Amino acid sequence: MDSKMILYRGSLKSCNYSCSYCPFAKHPSSAREMEKDRMDWMKFCKSLEERAEDLGRFALMVVPYGEALIHPWYWEGLAFLSRLKQAEAVGVQTNFSFSAGQSGKLWREAKGRKEKLRLWATYHPEMVSPARFAKECREAAEEGIALCAGAVGVPENLSLIGELRRCLPDEIYLWINAMDGLKRAYTREEVQAFSAIDPFFIRELSAVPANFKNCRNRLFVEGNGKMQTCNISGRMPGNWYQEDFSFPSAVCRQKACSCYLAYGGRGDWVNTLLFGKYPLFRIPRYFPAVFLDIDGTLLQEGEREIDPLTAASLKVLKKMGTRLFFATSLPVPEAKKRCANVWELFDGGIFAVGAHLLWKEAGQKHGQMPRNKIRQKEALHQEYQEILYPLDEAVLSAVKARYKSLHCRLYAYRNKGKLYKITLCRREGCGWERAEERFLQDVLPETRKGSVRFLREENCMQVIPAGASKENGVKI
């Protein structure tokens, strides 16, 4: 069962801050309004407990208009939910103005699971100094609480936000949201300055076309039970509290995902790679190296080149020191053609399902290559190293003798004259059966049957050396 990401926003509209740009600044709420918010929240928490078994694994984040964590019932509810075995993470957006001592006591008394708590801490320069805010973040991190910090990218606040970055530990990510209502584009200097603070800021500047197909298993629930796919998608039929509730399919009426709560919650591989299983918590992951497929990952069906947002994300990973490698069934020339706009960001890769390995040396010690594998290693040119697993010409001759009866086209791939892959390709939508794979195995010479591997990929049958695979390529 797929994991679910649920956002909750109750009726709370009051805040203890008075930021000049915020409509909820010092918004007064009556005792009756506060009690309604409390009752709605506790009702929602109880309903999550009752539905947890049906929902399966999930994460919950509170995204209030006002400040939630100055009210004890939010701490109590989050702690309650954190004890559910199906709840993998619980979090909230906050200005970090709550009392750490009092809140920690509430959490402990409610037996909350601290390792599941996630905080999205927003810095408001008008209300708190960078040093004070950084101190609160640092102390929370030292308590073992996972968090991110961030601010709205107001150009006039650049120096203060830069100071906050210097005050924060390196391991706490400081994000920058593009400013709504700026009424002009950011200057080149401003983009560079904000990107130096938040390497992912470039993602805020690219419009992401809406696509509800990327928004499965996410839901935005209001205090009265009304639902949306995300905070901007528009209302969907039904209500969270209806008796015949089932997790709804995504509905979207927008043309673009215009904020992080919208584009950050999509099921895109980029979001998961950068920010983990539940990217809406905005806590980055860091890798020394990543291996990425081309078809279905870097390029979706129908795409002719890698989209600007994906390209920008890859540039950020490269800048942060992550080594990028391809892991694809495509041969090198085809991969280079299809990924021309990002090719230089990659340090090589695993091509032709592992039959052709190519990489730039980076001074690190590579794993020991298997001694019992047929291989050829040589410099492709000065900056690359290469391993090629050759395929015997007798295999090609045997396949050529029979392939026409399978109603397909045959492509043989060579590097410097050496055969390393055969692809049998049918028209789109026509797959391959296991019996056809056995038929091809039977036509091989007896002395070559153990040296070949067949791999069915949609409308293609790949014929490669037995020692070649993406998994082995990663190990090498």
Positions of the model-derived regions?
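Core AdoMet radical
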Residues: I6, K26-M39, L55-H71, L81-G101, ...
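Conserved acidic, metal-coordinating active-site core of Asp-based
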Residues: A394-I476
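Canonical Radical SAM [4Fe-4S] cluster-binding loop centered on the CxxxCxxC motif
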Residues: D2-K43, N231
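Accessory C-terminal segments flanking Radical SAM cores
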Residues: R184-I283
